[in-house]
Each structure stands twice: as structure tokens, then as C-alpha cells.
């Protein structure tokens, strides 16, 4: 995947990471895949006086992933990569969708729709 994202970034593709995992984990991982921190859409925790609160800001999961993409990305994605049904709405926005190591439900949908399915070794 690192080689793929390196090639995409090198050819001028704008890379984004969209996840329902917390933003500090996704930002760290995204850096390894050539995704700038400003192009990470992930769960944010509200911070008050330097302390994390119990309030979450923007939780991009299911349809909220698609909503965040429509709101924050300058254009709809050419390609989308996902591994679960929580990614379905996001994958439906992409011109080309890829199911990467998908769970059973997403793999079934991907095959029905003719999307690429990839199971890494």
C-alpha cells in the first residue's frame, strides 16, 4: 500500500485518509502513506484547557464519512478504499471503489457491484 500511495502522490493525486478511528492514530499512520495531516478526516476529541473531554467532534463513520467528504474535500474522490460496511457510503462516492481485505458483507456488495476486491497476503 505504501508503494501505491507513493506512486499516486508522485503522479499528482490528492490523498486523503478518512477513518472512524481517533485522529492522532490516523495522522501518524497517514504520514507513512504520504497523506498530509490537513487531509485526514478522523474522530477528534474535544480538548478544554489542555485536557481531553468526553466529547467527540466529528465521528466519520457510515453515512457521516460521505458527509464529511462532501463537506471538506474540494471534489469527489477518483478512488476509494475501504474494508467494512462502515465504508460503503464513502465508497459509493468514488469513481472507482476498492474493497481491501473486506469483511464478508462488504465483499458481497463489492462483488455485486463489480468493484475490485483485494486480499493482501
Regions found by a protein language model. Give the residues of each.
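C-terminal cap/substrate-recognition subdomain and adjoining C-terminal extension
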Residues: 1-121
Amino acid at each position: 500500500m505504501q508503494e501505491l500511495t507513493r506512486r499516486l502522490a508522485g503522479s499528482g493525486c490528492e490523498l486523503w485518509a478518512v477513518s472512524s478511528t481517533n485522529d492522532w492514530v490516523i495522522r501518524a499512520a497517514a504520514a507513512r502513506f504520504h497523506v498530509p495531516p490537513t487531509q485526514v478526516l478522523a474522530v477528534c476529541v474535544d480538548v478544554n484547557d489542555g485536557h481531553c473531554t468526553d466529547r467527540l467532534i466529528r465521528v466519520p463513520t457510515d453515512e457521516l464519512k460521505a458527509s464529511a467528504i462532501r463537506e471538506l474535500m474540494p471534489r469527489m474522490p477518483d478512488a476509494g478504499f475501504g474494508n467494512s460496511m462502515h465504508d460503503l457510503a464513502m465508497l459509493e462516492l468514488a469513481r472507482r471503489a476498492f474493497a481491501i481485505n473486506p469483511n464478508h458483507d462488504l465483499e458481497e456488495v463489492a462483488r455485486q457491484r463489480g468493484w475490485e476486491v483485494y486480499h493482501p497476503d
